[in-house]
Amino acid sequence: MTNIRKSHPLIKIINESFIDLPAPSNISAWWNFGSLLGVCLILQILTGLFLAMHYTSDTATAFSSVTHICRDVNYGWIIRYMHANGASMFFICLFMHIGRGMYYGSYTFSETWNIGILLLFTVMATAFMGYVLPWGQMSFWGATVITNLLSAIPYIGTNLVEWIWGGFSVDKATLTRFFAFHFILPFIIAALAAVHLLFLHETGSNNPSGLTSNSDKIPFHPYYTIKDILGLLLLIMALMLLVLFSPDLLGDPDNYTPANPLNTPPHIKPEWYFLFAYAILRSIPNKLGGVVALVLSILILAVMPLLHTSKQRSMMFRPLSQCLFWLLVADLLTLTWIGGQPVEHPFITIGQLASILYFFTILVLMPISSMIENRFLKW
C-alpha cells in the first residue's frame, strides 16, 4: 500500500510543495522570507477577519468603531495592533525577499519574478486601502492625495478620479468600496502566491552561488521546515515586541484625530513602507512626471532580467556589483527618510539626487559593472 501522502490527490500537492520538495542544500537564511510572507498573509487575513466583525464602513461611525474595537472588544486592542504592525512586518519581509532576489539573480526565473511584481503591486494597493479605513486625518488626506494623482492621466484623469471616489470628493462611497476591496484583495494575493509557488516549483529554487544545484538536493522536510520555524519564531517575537511595547511607533499621531475635510494636516505622508516611492513622486515638479516616476520606481523591477549582462547569475562572486547593490539599499533608505521630511531646502535637493541615483544605479551602473566584471574574468 502506497503512503497516503503520496497517493491522495490533495495531500500529494502539499507533499510535493512542502515535504518531499527537493531543495538546494546551501540556501541561506535569506530564503526564509518566502515562508515568512506566507505566515504574514495568514496572520493579516485572520486578524483582519476579526476586525471586520466589529468595524463599520461608514464615515459617521468608522473612527468610533475602531475606538470601540480597542476599548470594548475583548483583546480588540491586540488584534488591531497586530494587524497594523503586521502590515509593517509584511513589508519588511517583502523588501528583504525582493532584495534577496536582486542580489542572487533570482529574477532570471522570469515568470516567478513577474508574478512577484504583480503581488507587490497588489499588496501595496491593499495596504493603502487599509490605511484609509480607520478614517483618521491621515487616512482621509492620504486617500485624497493619492487618488488625486490619477487626475494627472491625460483626458480621462478627472473622470477616473471621480469614478473611484464615487462622488466629487473622498466620502462615504469611497470608504465603503475601499473596505470591500481591502477585504477581497488578500484572498487574491493568496491565489497569486499559489501561482508564484507553482512557477517556482517548475524550475526549483535558486541558491547563493547562482549555480545549478541539481546534483546536490535535500528534502524540504525536516531540514527547511525546522529552519522556517526558527524564522517564524523570530518574526513573531519581533512583531510582539512592537505590538506590546510600542504599537504606535510606526503610525502617525494625526490618525488619532477623526477625519476633517476642512482641516489639512501640516505634513501629509503615507506609512513608512511607501515613503521611498512618495519621495520619488515629490522630487519631480511636474504632476504627470511624478506619477510616471512613482509607477516606474516599482515597475523597474520588471526590466531587471533584461539588464542582466553578467555571465554569472549571483552577486556572490562579483564585488563591484555588490558595492552597487548596497549603494542602492543606502539610496532607498535615504529616500525613505526624505519621504517623511517636509518639502523644503535641503530635503528637496537630496530627494531629487537620491531619485536620480536610484534609476541611474539600476539602469546604467549595474549593467556596466557586470560587463566590467566579465572583462576582469576574460569572459
Swiss-Prot record:
Transmembrane helix listed as a keyword: yes
GO molecular function, one term: metal ion binding
Cofactor note: Binds 2 heme b groups non-covalently.
Subcellular location: Mitochondrion inner membrane
Binding-site list for a ubiquinone: 201
Binding site for heme b b562: 83, 182
Role summary: Component of the ubiquinol-cytochrome c reductase complex (complex III or cytochrome b-c1 complex) that is part of the mitochondrial respiratory chain. The b-c1 complex mediates electron transfer from ubiquinol to cytochrome c. Contributes to the generation of a proton gradient across the mitochondrial membrane that is then used for ATP synthesis.
Protein name: Cytochrome b
Organism: Salanoia concolor (Malagasy brown-tailed mongoose)
Origin organism lineage: Eukaryota, Metazoa, Chordata, Craniata, Vertebrata
